[in-house]
Design a protein with these regions (language model features):
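Short hydrophobic/aromatic-enriched beta-strand-loop microsegments
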Residues: 135-141
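Alpha-helix capping/helix-boundary segments
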Residues: 22-23, 53, 85, 105-106, ...
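Short, well-structured N-terminal submotif of metal-dependent ribonuclease cores
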Residues: 1-49, 58-76
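Short, polar loop motifs at secondary-structure junctions
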Residues: 62-63, 121-125
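Acidic catalytic patch
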Residues: 75-96
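Short beta-strand scaffold positions
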Residues: 49, 80, 101, 120-121
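Acidic, metal-associated active-site segment
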Residues: 57, 100-117, 125
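Short loop/helix-cap segments at secondary-structure boundaries that form the rim of catalytic
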Residues: 126-133
Length: 141
């Protein structure tokens, strides 16, 4: 029985956050990565890429980067690494004793977006950084 005046809780939208390894896997036609994207589309899941993953994967706009640029053009949004993300990443690095700044910025972006699933080719580092954040799950591409 709902209390009178109580606001109905709505779940946070589902998010799929792609790190650079996931973007590269998609650009190469990796079937496992495509499966994650297909399920995201089927379920209305928002697909995001941190700006640091864009920097890691793009080397120009020429033919060599065409597959990566096609993937990035289809993404719902880019998670910008602003001061809040940088500070959150710094907190994660301090709490875990790691020095994987790019991975920390990926996790920080996911935290600030409200959680979600991170698709990565390097789950060990991402899991370590996200271990205290239950609203984030990590999946290997």
């Amino acid at each position: 029985v709902a209390r009178r005046g109580a606001r109905k809780q709505t779940p946070a939208p589902s998010r799929l956050i792609l790190d650079s390894g996931a973007v590269i896997a998609l650009a190469r036609g990796d079937q496992r990565a495509r499966g994650f994207i297909e399920r995201a589309i089927e379920t209305g899941c928002e697909v995001l890429v941190p700006s640091v993953a864009v920097a890691e994967t793009v080397r120009g706009r020429g033919p060599r980067d065409a597959p990566v640029n096609r993937i990035l053009a289809a993404i719902d949004s880019v998670l910008v690494a602003d001061e809040a993300a940088a500070r959150t990443a710094g907190d994660l690095l301090g709490a875990t004793g790691t020095d994987e700044t790019i991975d920390a910025l990926v996790v920080a972006g996911a935290i600030l977006a409200g959680g979600g699933r991170i698709l990565t080719s390097d789950p060990a580092n991402i899991k370590k950084l996200a271990r205290a954040t239950p609203e984030i799950t990590v999946h290997r591409v």
